[in-house]
């Protein structure tokens, strides 16, 4: 696909005079364009749901969720991956973010990195990619060689693959088994795909990882019951989670958390089923960590 024919490279009539307007009007133009992004994502919800189901199936069988991208797309994948361990208590290697150019590229532009097909393949090899893993290629343009080669290699291994781009019919979309293509239109600043396209990608990644965690029993109601208390704010959040899930007071919630080494799931089952920490943990283990199953089946 030629660059000049891509929707993400088009000229946006709404911002054609943005360099001549007031600061407030400038903000209004950008905000009005940003409002269209959730609607674009809404149109591809069935595709996102299908991807979540596949990701969950693979991860449940021992696989990992691997994001691969360049520039903004790569950084968004790393951001999403890095938030999963503290929010949901998963091991750091379960959700992985890869970026063209490596760690240095998180904060700096690395010349030519996104054009390296070899780089995409090697980065996946270096993390020991297996057929059980799911590889999600992220590229606003849908034409990034680093990402396309990574998806091709993943498919050769037998991996399930997902391609996220903002240009219909792009190479990323056609290479991946599942395509998620929120069409956000031309950017306010022509070609600046870190804007609407980047926002759309972030919304999609939010759904992929959150959907995976919900389906994996990491959420009870709408509470993040596997949150790791790495700071004072999260200690307080744990207490509030146990309170909200059980209706108990703060003192009882804190006592239960202390008794089970600050595991919200165990504390919730302790309070709701009137169990000690060991028995509550045992029942959770018997039901794969799903609080709902412990409560519904016992």
Swiss-Prot record:
Keyword Transcription: no
InterPro entries: Etherase_MurQ, Glucokinase_regulatory_CS, MURQ/GCKR, SIS_dom, SIS_dom_sf
GO biological process, one term: amino sugar catabolic process
Involved pathway(s): Amino-sugar metabolism; 1,6-anhydro-N-acetylmuramate degradation; Amino-sugar metabolism; N-acetylmuramate degradation; Cell wall biogenesis; peptidoglycan recycling
SUPFAM superfamilies referenced in this protein's UniProt entry, alphabetically: SIS domain
Pfam families, alphabetized: GKRP_SIS_N
Principal EC category: lyase
Documented EC number(s): 4.2.1.126
Entry's induction text: Induced by MurNAc 6-phosphate that releases the repressor MurR from the DNA. Repressed by MurR in the absence of MurNAc 6-phosphate.
Catalytic site: 83 (proton donor), 114
Domain of life, per lineage: Bacteria
GO terms of molecular function: carbohydrate derivative binding; carbon-oxygen lyase activity; ether hydrolase activity
Span of domain SIS: 55-218
Catalytic activity: N-acetyl-D-muramate 6-phosphate + H2O = N-acetyl-D-glucosamine 6-phosphate + (R)-lactate
Keywords from the named record: Carbohydrate metabolism, Lyase
Subunit record text: Homodimer.
Function: Specifically catalyzes the cleavage of the D-lactyl ether substituent of MurNAc 6-phosphate, producing GlcNAc 6-phosphate and D-lactate. Together with AnmK, is also required for the utilization of anhydro-N-acetylmuramic acid (anhMurNAc) either imported from the medium or derived from its own cell wall murein, and thus plays a role in cell wall recycling.
NCBIfam families per UniProt: N-acetylmuramic acid 6-phosphate etherase, PRK05441.1, PRK12570.1
The family this protein is said to belong to: Belongs to the GCKR-like family. MurNAc-6-P etherase subfamily.
PANTHER family: GLUCOKINASE REGULATORY PROTEIN
Note: A lyase-type mechanism (elimination/hydration) is suggested for the cleavage of the lactyl ether bond of MurNAc 6-phosphate, with the formation of an alpha,beta-unsaturated aldehyde intermediate with (E)-stereochemistry, followed by the syn addition of water to give product.
Identification of the protein by name: N-acetylmuramic acid 6-phosphate etherase
Origin species: Escherichia fergusonii (strain ATCC 35469 / DSM 13698 / CCUG 18766 / IAM 14443 / JCM 21226 / LMG 7866 / NBRC 102419 / NCTC 12128 / CDC 0568-73)
Lineage: Bacteria, Pseudomonadati, Pseudomonadota, Gammaproteobacteria, Enterobacterales
């Amino acid at each position: 696909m030629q660059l000049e024919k891509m929707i993400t490279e088009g000229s946006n009539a709404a911002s054609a005079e943005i360099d001549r307007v007031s600061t407030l009007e400038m903000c209004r133009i950008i905000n009005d364009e940003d409002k269209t992004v959730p609607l674009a994502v809404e149109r591809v919800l069935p595709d996102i749901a299908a991807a979540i189901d596949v990701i969950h199936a693979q991860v449940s069988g021992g696989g990992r969720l691997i994001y691969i991208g360049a520039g903004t797309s790569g950084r968004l994948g790393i951001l999403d991956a890095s938030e999963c361990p503290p929010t949901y208590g998963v091991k750091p290697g379960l959700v992985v973010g890869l970026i063209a150019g490596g760690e240095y590229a998180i904060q700096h532009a690395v010349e030519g990195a996104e054009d390296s097909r070899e780089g995409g393949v090697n980065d996946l090899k270096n993390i020991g990619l297996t057929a059980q893993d799911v590889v999600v290629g992220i590229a606003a343009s849908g034409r990034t060689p680093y990402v396309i080669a990574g998806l091709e290699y993943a498919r050769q291994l037998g991996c399930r693959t997902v391609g996220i781009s903002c240009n219909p019919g792009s190479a990323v979309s056609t290479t991946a088994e599942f395509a998620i293509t929120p069409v956000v239109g031309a950017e306010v600043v022509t070609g600046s795909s870190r804007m609407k396209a980047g926002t759309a990608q972030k919304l999609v990644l939010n759904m992929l990882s959150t959907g995976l965690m919900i389906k994996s029993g990491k959420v009870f109601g709408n509470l993040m019951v596997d949150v790791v208390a790495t700071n004072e704010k999260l200690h307080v959040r744990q207490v509030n989670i146990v309170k909200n899930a059980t209706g108990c007071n703060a003192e009882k919630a804190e006592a239960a958390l202390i008794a089970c080494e600050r595991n919200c799931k165990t504390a919730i089952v302790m309070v709701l089923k009137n169990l000690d920490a060991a028995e509550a943990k045992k029942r959770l283990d018997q039901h794969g960590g799903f609080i709902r199953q412990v409560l519904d089946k016992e």
